[in-house]
C-alpha cells in the first residue's frame, strides 16, 4: 500500500502510523484549544503575486472567529471582497478536524463556487 495519499508527499495514506513527540502533542493541543492559532499557523491562501502564503487575519476576521465560537447562530452583514469566505472556511476546517462525528456543508449560489471553496 502507498504511504501517501494520491501521490502527495504532504498527505499520509489511510492507516499510516504517526509518531507523536511531546512537542507535537503540545502543538496539537494548542491548535485544538485555539482556532486562531491553528488558522494563523496552518492555513495557507494563494496570493496573486506571492503564491502560497500564511493567512494573516485582520482584527475583524479574528472577531468573526470568536463570534463563531461563542454564538450558535451568526449573521455577518459585511461588504464584498473582505475575506469572509476564507475566514469561514478556515474556521470550518478547524471545526471538522478537531471535533468528532460532525457534518459540514458548503452552500453557494452555484455548484462551481461551492467546489472552489472546498
Tell me what each language-model feature is:
Residues 2-118:
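Phosphate/NTP-binding elements of NTP-utilizing enzymes
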Amino acid at each position: 500500500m502507498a504511504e501517501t495519499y494520491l501521490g502527495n508527499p504532504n498527505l499520509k495514506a489511510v492507516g499510516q502510523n504517526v509518531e507523536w513527540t511531546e512537542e507535537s502533542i503540545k502543538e496539537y493541543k494548542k491548535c485544538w484549544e485555539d482556532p486562531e492559532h491553528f488558522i494563523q499557523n496552518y492555513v495557507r491562501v494563494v496570493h496573486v503575486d506571492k503564491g502560497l502564503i500564511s493567512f494573516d487575519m485582520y482584527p475583524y476576521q479574528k472577531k468573526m472567529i470568536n463570534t463563531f465560537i461563542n454564538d450558535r447562530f451568526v449573521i455577518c452583514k459585511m461588504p464584498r471582497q473582505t475575506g469572509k469566505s476564507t475566514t469561514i472556511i478556515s474556521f470550518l476546517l478547524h471545526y471538522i478536524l478537531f471535533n468528532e462525528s460532525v457534518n459540514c456543508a458548503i452552500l453557494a449560489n452555484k455548484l462551481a463556487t461551492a467546489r472552489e471553496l472546498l
